């Protein structure tokens, strides 16, 4: 076998491979003998059919199969010999082919980029310094009370925090439009569900009032025919309701499965959950900054084959969100996933290089700690831990998580790390903050 390597544009490579004719003919002859020996032919005892007859019947198909197998096998031998690391499947193209002739073919493919990590010392990581305070726990308990609240009709004006039931009809230039009409529509005031100005027009109104408001649809509204349009809404208020919060007592506590200890036990459980969420949020914020810095400091070429693979993964995930509708997900445009796919490939390649250069292997103690920490969110943590330990696939998945965390730790060890005091709510709700 003769091999030459061509460097094409970017990460593209082309191998020119020549396979001696004897290799091809020997493989074809061997396969034809196998057919003659094992298949039945009318008028002949098994294994006694003339080879010329077998060659006439199957020669062309066998040669095609042999050529495909030979190209694949010699491609693998060639990349091993040349120490090349393909990033995707090759495209084969015969250059010279024919009975009794050497097989000359090309294999075109992409290779992984050569990554040389740099600039880790320039990465800035701001570590959040936060804790769960009594006030945070009290606020969370208030949120739980709101989630369990009931609504009671009141003889009061509509305002933020109250709920109204309304009939409305929307029109543009005197003409009603699709989706602009509803009856007994429940609207929680201040929730921001409607277009700007809609809720403002209802504030101060009471049961039975009928009125018209003027609003303008946002330029980025989802319905193309309504973007930026001025509209009128005729509205009737059917009722106004106020939220009634349940008392923080044993009956309320029982709704959350806390059998003993009353309110204090619920507070302790809430604090424990909040502290677990806080720990995860701090870890995620640090990881996000470390990876962002790594990507910024290390621009690399990305094999399109890997991007294509990642797009397929994202499409499959989209199909799961669509209830398993693979066909619907397949129709989604490539552009919808391309940026995210490229980002994931870049991060994967860079973290892989961090792991390689630091000779990292999954720390089994860290793996156990991650499983134990994750299991605390379940009713029976020991059962969850046991389930993981008995499932090799789940254990390998957790080893990958641990290895990625170790890679992030290696980045942070060389980065510029500072601490910043931040509240629990600011960390958990950065947009609202």
From Swiss-Prot:
<feature type="domain" description="PPIase FKBP-type">
    <location>
        <begin position="161"/>
        <end position="246"/>
    </location>
</feature>
<comment type="similarity">
    <text>Belongs to the FKBP-type PPIase family. Tig subfamily.</text>
</comment>
<dbReference type="GO" id="GO:0043022">
    <property type="term" value="F:ribosome binding"/>
</dbReference>
<dbReference type="InterPro" id="IPR027304">
    <property type="entry name" value="Trigger_fact/SurA_dom_sf"/>
</dbReference>
<dbReference type="InterPro" id="IPR005215">
    <property type="entry name" value="Trig_fac"/>
</dbReference>
<dbReference type="GO" id="GO:0005737">
    <property type="term" value="C:cytoplasm"/>
</dbReference>
<dbReference type="Pfam" id="PF00254">
    <property type="entry name" value="FKBP_C"/>
</dbReference>
<keyword id="KW-0697">Rotamase</keyword>
<dbReference type="InterPro" id="IPR008881">
    <property type="entry name" value="Trigger_fac_ribosome-bd_bac"/>
</dbReference>
<dbReference type="GO" id="GO:0043335">
    <property type="term" value="P:protein unfolding"/>
</dbReference>
<keyword id="KW-0963">Cytoplasm</keyword>
<protein>
    <recommendedName>
        <fullName>Trigger factor</fullName>
        <ecNumber>5.2.1.8</ecNumber>
    </recommendedName>
</protein>
<keyword id="KW-0413">Isomerase</keyword>
<dbReference type="Pfam" id="PF05698">
    <property type="entry name" value="Trigger_C"/>
</dbReference>
<dbReference type="InterPro" id="IPR001179">
    <property type="entry name" value="PPIase_FKBP_dom"/>
</dbReference>
<keyword id="KW-0131">Cell cycle</keyword>
<dbReference type="Pfam" id="PF05697">
    <property type="entry name" value="Trigger_N"/>
</dbReference>
<dbReference type="GO" id="GO:0044183">
    <property type="term" value="F:protein folding chaperone"/>
</dbReference>
<comment type="function">
    <text>Involved in protein export. Acts as a chaperone by maintaining the newly synthesized protein in an open conformation. Functions as a peptidyl-prolyl cis-trans isomerase.</text>
</comment>
<dbReference type="GO" id="GO:0015031">
    <property type="term" value="P:protein transport"/>
</dbReference>
<dbReference type="InterPro" id="IPR046357">
    <property type="entry name" value="PPIase_dom_sf"/>
</dbReference>
<dbReference type="InterPro" id="IPR037041">
    <property type="entry name" value="Trigger_fac_C_sf"/>
</dbReference>
<keyword id="KW-0143">Chaperone</keyword>
<dbReference type="GO" id="GO:0003755">
    <property type="term" value="F:peptidyl-prolyl cis-trans isomerase activity"/>
</dbReference>
<dbReference type="GO" id="GO:0051301">
    <property type="term" value="P:cell division"/>
</dbReference>
<dbReference type="GO" id="GO:0061077">
    <property type="term" value="P:chaperone-mediated protein folding"/>
</dbReference>
<keyword id="KW-0132">Cell division</keyword>
<dbReference type="InterPro" id="IPR036611">
    <property type="entry name" value="Trigger_fac_ribosome-bd_sf"/>
</dbReference>
<dbReference type="InterPro" id="IPR008880">
    <property type="entry name" value="Trigger_fac_C"/>
</dbReference>
<dbReference type="GO" id="GO:0051083">
    <property type="term" value="P:'de novo' cotranslational protein folding"/>
</dbReference>
């Amino acid at each position: 076998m003769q091999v030459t390597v061509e460097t094409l544009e970017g990460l593209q490579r082309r191998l020119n491979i020549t396979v001696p004719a004897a290799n091809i003919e020997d493989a074809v002859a061997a396969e034809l003998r196998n057919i003659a020996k094992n298949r039945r032919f009318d008028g002949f005892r098994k294994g006694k059919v003339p080879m010329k007859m077998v060659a006439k019947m199957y020669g062309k198909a066998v040669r095609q199969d042999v050529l495909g197998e030979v190209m694949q096998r010699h491609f693998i031998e060639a990349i091993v010999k040349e120490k090349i690391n393909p990033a995707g499947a090759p495209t084969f193209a015969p250059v010279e082919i024919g009975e009794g002739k050497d097989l000359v073919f090309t294999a075109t493919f992409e290779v992984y980029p050569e990554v040389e990590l740099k600039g880790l010392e320039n990465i800035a990581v701001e570590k959040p310094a936060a804790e769960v305070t009594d006030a945070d726990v009290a606020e969370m308990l208030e949120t739980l009370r709101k989630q369990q609240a009931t609504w009671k009709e009141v003889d009061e004006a509509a305002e933020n925090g109250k709920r109204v039931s309304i009939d409305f009809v929307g029109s543009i230039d005197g003409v009603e439009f699709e989706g602009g009409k509803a009856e007994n529509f429940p609207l929680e005031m201040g929730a921001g569900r409607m277009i700007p100005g809609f809720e403002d027009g209802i504030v101060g109104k009471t049961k039975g009032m009928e009125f018209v408001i003027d609003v303008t649809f946002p330029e980025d509204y989802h319905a193309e025919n309504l973007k930026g349009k001025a509209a009128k809404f005729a509205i009737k208020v059917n009722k106004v309701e106020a939220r009634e919060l349940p008392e923080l007592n044993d009956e309320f506590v029982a709704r959350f499965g806390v059998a003993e200890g009353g309110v204090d036990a619920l507070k302790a459980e809430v604090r424990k959950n909040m502290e677990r969420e806080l720990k995860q949020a701090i870890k995620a914020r640090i990881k996000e900054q470390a990876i962002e810095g790594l990507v910024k400091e290390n621009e690399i070429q990305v094999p399109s084959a890997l991007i294509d693979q990642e797009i397929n993964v994202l499409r499959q995930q989209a199909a799961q969100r669509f209830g398993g509708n693979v066909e619907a997900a397949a129709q989604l445009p490539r552009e919808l996933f391309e940026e995210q796919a490229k980002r994931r490939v870049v991060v994967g390649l860079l973290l892989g290089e961090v792991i390689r250069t630091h000779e990292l292997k999954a720390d089994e103690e860290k793996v156990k700690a991650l499983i134990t920490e994750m299991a605390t969110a379940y009713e029976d943590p020991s059962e969850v831990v046991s389930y993981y330990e008995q499932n090799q696939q789940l254990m390998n998945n957790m080893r990958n998580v641990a290895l990625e965390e170790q890679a992030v730790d290696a980045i942070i060890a060389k980065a510029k790390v500072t601490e910043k005091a931040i509240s629990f709510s600011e960390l958990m709700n950065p947009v609202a903050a």
